[in-house]
Amino acid sequence: MTEADLASAFARIEALVQARGLADAVRGTSYGTPSLKVKDRTFVRQLDASTIVLQCPLEQKVLLMEISPGIYFETDHYVGYDAVLVRLDAIEDEELSLRLEDAWRFKAQNGKEDRA
């Protein structure tokens, strides 16, 4: 995976965040990949060209993985953390946009920093 691959995949995320008007969303990096932060807290980051890490409450994570396992999943690394993995090729922009807003709200209101 090249920097260009990551940048291209993350452009979709940035466009959806901008379209939703999510104030104070700032581009950064997290673990060497593109991320977006609010109040200096990561709410989404690119894991690879086809997967993002999206912050969310544990209860929501469990529900999302039960309802749409083809879209939402976790690896051993994320078990017990307020983050869910999202397959970008399996999610429509409308749903992804809503999840991004949820993540933005979660981190804007939550002072706890999670492993992203």
Model-derived features: where do they sit?
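Charge-dense, helix-prone N-terminal extensions
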Residues: M1-A116
